[in-house]
């Protein structure tokens, strides 16, 4: 069983908090239309190995802050269809509890750059959930830039904020945009 706490920002920018308990059902098939993998960069190989070892087939929507080149990603994916995405929001799992948030959009690799069958079905899936898609010219470059900006913001927050009071630090950074210049 998995306890889920989600801050849903699709309709209200401040978010709506929901909590529920879900029963986890282990896979019943070996082939899927879509496998969503959301892991840190250093865990992609492990996730792909787990799918391979389990005999699980299907294209992967990879939500990951990947720093490498396309050739490295292709090697890690070992021939599996892959679509790069970035959820903009996020979360974490600790033991049997998922705490996360979702916004009204995600970043998704453009169709002409994706190595992914069924792109239209993924578009329809997000649309049915009230989540719009932003498609940068080059998804890998967008991820690199996003991660670099986050590192800069984190450095400034660490310099001017208080690691013991992250809420106050966020307010300082949000209202003191000149700190970021």
Give short role names for the model-derived ranges.
Residues 2-6, 26-29, 75-83, 132-141:
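Short, mixed-charge, low-aromatic patches
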Residues 11-98:
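Rossmann-like NAD(P)(H) cofactor-binding subdomain of soluble oxidoreductases
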Residues 1, 41, 60-63, 86-91, ...:
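Long, contiguous hydrophobic alpha-helical segments, chiefly transmembrane helices and signal peptides
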Residues 54, 79-81, 99-181:
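Internal alpha-helical scaffold of NAD(P)-dependent oxidoreductase catalytic cores
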């Amino acid at each position: 069983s998995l306890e889920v706490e989600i801050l849903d920002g699709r309709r209200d920018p401040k978010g709506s908090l929901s909590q529920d308990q879900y029963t986890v059902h282990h896979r019943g098939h070996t082939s899927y239309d879509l496998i969503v993998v959301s892991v840190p960069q250093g865990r992609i190989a492990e996730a792909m190995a787990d799918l391979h070892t389990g005999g699980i087939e299907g294209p992967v929507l990879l939500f990951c802050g990947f720093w490498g080149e396309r050739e490295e990603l292709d090697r890690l994916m070992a021939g599996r269809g892959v679509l790069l995405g970035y959820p903009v929001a996020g979360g974490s799992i600790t033991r049997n509890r998922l705490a996360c948030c979702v916004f009204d959009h995600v970043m998704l690799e453009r169709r002409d750059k994706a190595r992914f069958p069924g792109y239209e079905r993924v578009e329809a899936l997000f649309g049915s959930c009230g989540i719009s898609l932003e498609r940068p010219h080059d998804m890998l470059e967008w991820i690199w830039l996003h991660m670099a900006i986050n590192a800069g913001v984190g450095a400034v927050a660490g310099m001017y904020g208080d690691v013991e009071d992250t809420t106050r630090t966020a307010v300082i950074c949000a209202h003191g945009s000149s700190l970021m210049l």
